[in-house]
Amino acid sequence: MLDLKFILNNKNEVIKKLSTRNYDLANITKINNLGEMRSKLIFELEKLQAKRNKLSDEIGIKKRNNENCDSLIEEVNAIKAQIEKVDHEADDIISQVNDILTKIPNLPYDDVPVGSDELDNKVIKEHASLGRGLVKGVEAHYDIATKLDIIDFTRAVKLAQTRFVLYKNAGAKLIRALANFMLDTHINNGYKEIMPAHLVNSKMLFGTGQLPKFKDDLFRVSDSDLWLIPTAEVPLTNYHYDEILNLNEPIKYVAYTKCFRSEAGSGGRDTRGIIRQHEFHKVELVKIVRQEDAMGEWEKMVNDAKNILTLLELPYREILLCTGDMGFSSAKTIDLEIWIPSEQRYRETSSISICKDFQARRAKIRYKDADGKTKYAFTMNGSGVAIDRVMAAILENYQNSDGTITVPKVLVPYMNGITKIEAK
């Protein structure tokens, strides 16, 4: 959430940056107007309170002198009613302002490319020579997985509905291997592992920015205030909800969880395979840092995510997202897109975002600087990485002409020594 004072004092800058984020700028004008109205009400409130206090003093004097003060008491009661009315109007304005504030996206850094959608994103670097390079002419992951009997799509639909899958045999083992490999790698790089619950309350989803704006993208437990997590970013960041932290060293967390998304608005995209599911597996990275340390720590996080794909020897590219394609809470995002041979294109497998103090304001995560001043922390998060999409990439990039799948070298120890997945 943006700071209201910053918006009011830097209206032109805010409008300029939000104009690049497909945001309705009329709301900024509305906030300014509401701010002016509230200032007038507060001025009126202060005058009424001063008048009430003066009359109350006069009543006290008259009572001590045994003089009649009925008319003054009536006047004070009338002023109290006015104060209550003005107070209510001011509270209503605050409610309107907060409602707008909660739905304003983060302001992008100055070096983020301006654009309206993914077509305006900027390719930073391509790592096309990793592994076997940009493979062509292979079976789609969903076809080869069915032949190898490692994913069951049909029974998953029977058990639930479309966009769910059942991993089995070597497929289940590969999912576990990927998760454990990623966790071990990140833990060795200084992240602390947390295993959170898959359910959180609405206050936590507000903290990281999913609510109220993206309610339709979430799964909610009926008749309760519990929601399935769309990403472990939610519990990891809100782990320090409403706390003042010691940030002499960055706080670094990693978690492997299931994630749940309704995929509202995805329509008929990616209806086959494991690219887009309602329930999927992901290793998530979160850092909470001092403001001055943020950019350096974010760049390290980008490298931590890249390291996973490099070790797996899977071709990928780095994309700097434009202003119109970034997530709601992000001030700058780099996507890592992995090569999917059957589609002959790259697909996102990680987004690494720095959020400035946007989430920390919502979640009230603070720290004390060297001078003892309390400040909002800076937060960042990134997929480290999305496991199902990596599995799809392995099934295609490591596919052999005899219909088997070579297990990436770094995963062999996690696969009990299995070097090849083949039909049983």
From Swiss-Prot:
L-serine binds at residues 231-233, 284, 383. InterPro entries: aa-tRNA-synt_IIb, aa-tRNA-synth_II, aa-tRNA-synth_II/BPL/LPL, Ser-tRNA-ligase_type_1, Ser-tRNA-synth_1_N, SerRS_1_N_sf, SerRS_core, tRNA-bd_arm. One of its GO terms (molecular function) is serine-tRNA ligase activity. It holds the Pfam family tRNA-synt_2b. It comes from the Bacteria. GO terms for biological process: selenocysteine biosynthetic process; seryl-tRNA aminoacylation. ATP binds at residues 261-263, 348-351. Catalyzes the attachment of serine to tRNA(Ser). Is also able to aminoacylate tRNA(Sec) with serine, to form the misacylated tRNA L-seryl-tRNA(Sec), which will be further converted into selenocysteinyl-tRNA(Sec). Homodimer. The tRNA molecule binds across the dimer. Belongs to the class-II aminoacyl-tRNA synthetase family. Type-1 seryl-tRNA synthetase subfamily. This is Serine--tRNA ligase. It comes from Metamycoplasma arthritidis (strain 158L3-1) (Mycoplasma arthritidis).
